[in-house]
Amino acid sequence: MDPSSKKVTGRLMLAVGGAVLGSLQFGYNTGVINAPQKVIEEFYNQTWNHRYGEPIPSTTLTTLWSLSVAIFSVGGMIGSFSVGLFVNRFGRRNSMLMMNLLAFVAAVLMGFSKLGKSFEMLILGRFIIGVYCGLTTGFVPMYVGEVSPTALRGALGTLHQLGIVVGILIAQVFGLDSIMGNADLWPLLLSVIFIPALLQCILLPFCPESPRFLLINRNEENRAKSVLKKLRGTADVTRDLQEMKEEGRQMMREKKVTILELFRSPAYRQPILIAVVLQLSQQLSGINAVFYYSTSIFEKAGVQQPVYATIGSGIVNTAFTVVSLFVVERAGRRTLHLIGLAGMAGCAVLMTIALALLERLPWMSYLSIVAIFGFVAFFEVGPGPIPWFIVAELFSQGPRPAAIAVAGFSNWTSNFIVGMCFQYVEQLCGPYVFIIFTVLLVLFFIFTYFKVPETKGRTFDEIASGFRQGGASQSDKTPEELFHPLGADSQV
C-alpha cells in the first residue's frame, strides 16, 4: 500500500475538523433540551399567565413541552430528505457553509424567546436547528468520506459520531444548574450554538471542496488534482485520480439516480436496504431508552447527584467512540457492528433482570449501572458510528446523495417514533421494555451477519461494482468474496 494513503496532512485534518463542527452541533442540540426542562416549563407557565391571566393547564404544558422536544426531529426529517437538493448544486463544502445561516437564525430565536415572552420563538428555533442538523447528518459523512484516503476513511468517518457524543457531553455539562441550566441563563444555553456556527464559517472557506465532486460532478480535473495534492501531501495523486475517473465513467453509463430508482434498480436495492436497516439498528437499539432510564436508576442506587452519573455515562459514550476510531480500520466495519449489537443485546438482558428484581434486591441497582455503562460502550463500538459513514461507502458518486437522504430520513423518522412512543410502551411493559430492544438487536445482528459486506480497504467503485455484479450475474465474485465472514479482511 502507498504510504501516502495513510498520511494525515494538516489540510485533511482542517477539512475534517471544519466539517465535524456540524456533528458537534447535532449532538449539542440533541442533548441540550433535557436538563433545563423544569425552568423552561416554568417560563411557559409565566408566559401563559402573562397572556391569559391564569396558570397554564397541565395538559397544555405537556403538549407544548413534547412539541418543543419532538419538533427537532421533525425538522431533522425534512432536512435529511433535502440533502441531495444542495450537495449536487452547490457542492459539499459550500452546502455546509450556507446552512450555518439556519443555526444563526435558530440561535437568535431561542436566545431571545424569554425576552420576547414567546414560547413560539423557542419552538420555531428548535424546528429550524432540527432542519440544520438533518442536513448536517447528510453533509458531514458525505464530505468526510470523499476527502479521506481509502485507508483512513473509516477512522475519519468515526469523527462524525465523536463530534455528536462530544456535543451531547458538552450539553450535559453546560446544562448543570450551577452553569447554564437555571432560570436566568437557559436562553444562553440554547443560543450558544452560534459559536460553533461562527467557527465553522471562519474555517470552511479555507477547506477544499470534495475532489470527487470537482472531478465527477463538475469535470474540473485540474482543481481536483490540486486539491488532492494538498489533502494527500504528495505530488503523485495518479492512483486517486484514476479511481475517481473510473467511477465517473461508470456514472456516465448510469442514468440519473432518483430516490425511487434506488428501490427499483436491482443494483441499488440491496445497498439501500442495508443502509436503511443499519440506520434503524442505531435508533431502535434502545440507546435513547437507556439514557431515559439512567437518572432514575442512579437515584435508586443511592447516587447523591444522579445528574453527574448521567454525565459519567456521557464520558463513557465519548471514550468508546475514540476506541472505535482507532480500531475501525483494523477490525473492519462489519465486525465492529456485530460486536456492538451482540454486546448491547447481552447488556439489555442484564438490565431487564436487574430492573425486574430491583424492588426485592436493592443491590441489583449496581448491576443496572454496570449494564448501562456496558450498553453505552457497545453502542459506540458499532451501532453509534458505523451506520453514518458506511452509507457513503456503499454507493458510488451518482446515487450517493439520494442514498444518504433516504438513510438520514430513516434515522430521523425512527428517532422521532422512539421519542414519541417509548414513554407509552415503558408504562405498558415496565422494566420488560428492554426485551423488545433485545429482540430487535438480535434481528439486526442476524441481518448484519448475512447481508452486510465488509467495506474496509475498498474503493467506492469496488464496493459499488460488487453490488452491481451481485444484482446482475454474480459472474466475477462469489457471495463469499462479497460478504466476508466475521472479521475477514478485504485487501485492495
From Swiss-Prot:
Q: Which residues are glycosylated?
A: 45
One GO CC term on file: vesicle
Q: Any idea which residues bear Phosphoserine here?
A: 226, 465, 490
Provide the primary localization.
Answer: membrane
Q: For side Cytoplasmic, which residue ranges? A: 1-11, 88-90, 145-155, 207-271, 329-334, 389-401, 451-492
**Coiled-coil positions:** none
Q: Which reaction does it catalyse?
A: D-glucose(out) = D-glucose(in)
Compartment(s): Cell membrane; Photoreceptor inner segment
Q: What gene makes this protein?
A: Slc2a1
Record organism: Mus musculus
- List residues modified as N-acetylmethionine: 1
Tissues where the protein occurs: Retina (at protein level).
Kindly provide the PTM information from the record.
Phosphorylation at Ser-226 by PKC promotes glucose uptake by increasing cell membrane localization.
Q: List ligand-binding residues for D-glucose.
A: 161, 282-283, 288, 317, 380, 388
Transmembrane feature ranges: 12-33, 67-87, 91-112, 121-144, 156-176, 186-206, 272-293, 307-328, 335-355, 366-388, 402-422, 430-450
In this UniProt entry, the residues modified to Phosphothreonine are 478
Q: Could you say which protein family the record assigns here?
A: Belongs to the major facilitator superfamily. Sugar transporter (TC 2.A.1.1) family. Glucose transporter subfamily.
Where are the annotated segments for Disordered? Answer: 468-492
Q: What is this protein called?
A: Solute carrier family 2, facilitated glucose transporter member 1
Q: Which residues form the signal peptide?
A: none
Q: What does this protein do?
A: Facilitative glucose transporter, which is responsible for constitutive or basal glucose uptake. Has a very broad substrate specificity; can transport a wide range of aldoses including both pentoses and hexoses. Most important energy carrier of the brain: present at the blood-brain barrier and assures the energy-independent, facilitative transport of glucose into the brain. In association with BSG and NXNL1, promotes retinal cone survival by increasing glucose uptake into photoreceptors. Required for mesendoderm differentiation.
Residue ranges, Extracellular side? 34-66, 113-120, 177-185, 294-306, 356-365, 423-429
Q: How does it assemble?
A: Found in a complex with ADD2, DMTN and SLC2A1. Interacts (via C-terminus cytoplasmic region) with DMTN isoform 2. Interacts with SNX27; the interaction is required when endocytosed to prevent degradation in lysosomes and promote recycling to the plasma membrane. Interacts with GIPC (via PDZ domain). Interacts with STOM. Interacts with SGTA (via Gln-rich region). Interacts with isoform 1 of BSG. Interacts with SMIM43; the interaction may promote SLC2A1-mediated glucose transport to meet the energy needs of mesendoderm differentiation.
Q: Which CDD domains match?
A: MFS_GLUT_Class1
The alphabetical list of record keywords is:
Acetylation, Cell membrane, Glycoprotein, Membrane, Phosphoprotein, Sugar transport, Transmembrane, Transmembrane helix, Transport
